[in-house]
C-alpha cells in the first residue's frame, strides 16, 4: 500500500475531465495526481483525509483538492450507494498560458486558493447546479459552464483544508508507510491506539515513527488522531445527538475519559460539545 501517483483517465478529444462515481466504496487508496480536483458529494457521508487534516463530508458538500495533494474520500456506509461528481484539470489543460491571459486574471485567485484546498461554505446552489449539469454538456457549453463555476468559486466563502503543502511527489517507500498509517488509524481510531501499536504497522520504532509522521504531516501522530476522533464526534453530534448521550458519543469516538473529550473538543472547536449541538440547531445561548 502506498500513496498512489494516480493517473486520471482522460477521454479522447476532451480537455476537461468529468467523472461521475456511483459505487458503494469510493476509491479507497490515499493518492495524489497532477490535476486540481473539484468534487461535489451528491450522496454520501464520511471523512476526507487531505494533507495533514481530516474533514467530515455529507450530502451537498463541495471540495477543491490541490494539485499533488495526497487525499482520500472514505465514505461511512458501505451498504448504500455513494455518489459524487468530480472535475479534473491542470493549469495547462486549455494551453500553457490559458490561465495567464490578461482577460482571465481574476481566475488566478482560484488557482492560488486551490493549492491548500478548500471547502465551500454557505450557499452552494449555483455551484451544485453547475456540477450536476456539467456531465451532460458537450464541448463549448461545458467549457462555458466550467468557467462560470470557477468564477462562482472565487466569490464563495471558503474554509482551507490543509496548511501543509506537499512536494510534488512522495517517495514510494514513504508513501507506502503513510498509506498504511492512515488506513490503520481511520479503521481503528474508535479503539485504544498507542505508539507501539501504530509504529508496529510500519515496522518502525516509536521514536522514529514520531519523527517520520511529524515530517510528513507537520503535526504529531496524536494531534492527528485526536482531530480524527473529534471530527467523528461532530458527525455523531450532528446526526444522533437526540439518540446518544455525549458520554456515548465520546466513547464511540475513541475517548475513554469524558473530561478529556470535553477538553479536546473545546480546544479544537472553541465550544463544549453540548454548546456545539445547540449551535447546529440554531439555539442561541441564554
Q: Where do the protein language model's features map onto the residues?
A:
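Generic protein-terminus/edge-of-domain signal
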Residues: 1-61, 68-69, 260, 285
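A hydrophobic/aromatic-rich effector-binding and dimerization subdomain
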Residues: 2-16, 70-131, 155-160
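Hydrophobic, aromatic-enriched interface-forming segments
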Residues: 134, 138-179
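Basic/polar phosphate-binding segments, predominantly the helix-turn-helix DNA-binding elements
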Residues: 158, 163-172, 184-228, 250-276
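Pre-recognition alpha-helix immediately N-terminal to the DNA-recognition helix
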Residues: 177-184, 229-236
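Short amphipathic helical patch at the helix-1/turn junction of helix-turn-helix
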Residues: 189-190, 237-242
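Short, basic, alpha-helical segments at the C-terminal edge of helix-turn-helix-like DNA-binding modules
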Residues: 225-234, 275-286
Amino acid at each position: 500500500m502506498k500513496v498512489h501517483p494516480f493517473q486520471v483517465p482522460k477521454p479522447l478529444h476532451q480537455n476537461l475531465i468529468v467523472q461521475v462515481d456511483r459505487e458503494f466504496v469510493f476509491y479507497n487508496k490515499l493518492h495524489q495526481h497532477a490535476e486540481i480536483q473539484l468534487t461535489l458529494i451528491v450522496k454520501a457521508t464520511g471523512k476526507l483525509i487531505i494533507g495533514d487534516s481530516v474533514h467530515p463530508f455529507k450530502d451537498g458538500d463541495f471540495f477543491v483538492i490541490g494539485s499533488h495533494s495526497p487525499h482520500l474520500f472514505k465514505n461511512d456506509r458501505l451498504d448504500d450507494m455513494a455518489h459524487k461528481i468530480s472535475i479534473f484539470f491542470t493549469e495547462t489543460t486549455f494551453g500553457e498560458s490559458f490561465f495567464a491571459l490578461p482577460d482571465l486574471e481574476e481566475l488566478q485567485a482560484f488557482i492560488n486558493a486551490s493549492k491548500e484546498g478548500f471547502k465551500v461554505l454557505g450557499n452552494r446552489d449555483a455551484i451544485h447546479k453547475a456540477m450536476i449539469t456539467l456531465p451532460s454538456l458537450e464541448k463549448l457549453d461545458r467549457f462555458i459552464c466550467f468557467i462560470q463555476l470557477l468564477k462562482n468559486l472565487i466569490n464563495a466563502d471558503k474554509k482551507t483544508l490543509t496548511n501543509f503543502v506537499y512536494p510534488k511527489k512522495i517517495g514510494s517507500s514513504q508513501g507506502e508507510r503513510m498509506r498504511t498509517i492512515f488506513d490503520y488509524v481511520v479503521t481503528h481510531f474508535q479503539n485504544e491506539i498507542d505508539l507501539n501499536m501504530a509504529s508496529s504497522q510500519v515496522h518502525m520504532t516509536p521514536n522514529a515513527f514520531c519523527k517520520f509522521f511529524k515530517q510528513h504531516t507537520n503535526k504529531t501522530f496524536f494531534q492527528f488522531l485526536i482531530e480524527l476522533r473529534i471530527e467523528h464526534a461532530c458527525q455523531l453530534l450532528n446526526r444522533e445527538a437526540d439518540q446518544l448521550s455525549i458520554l456515548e458519543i465520546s466513547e464511540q469516538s475513541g475517548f475513554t475519559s469524558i473530561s478529556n473529550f470535553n477538553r479536546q473538543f473545546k480546544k479544537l472547536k472553541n465550544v463544549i460539545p453540548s454548546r456545539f449541538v445547540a449551535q447546529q440547531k440554531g439555539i442561541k445561548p441564554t
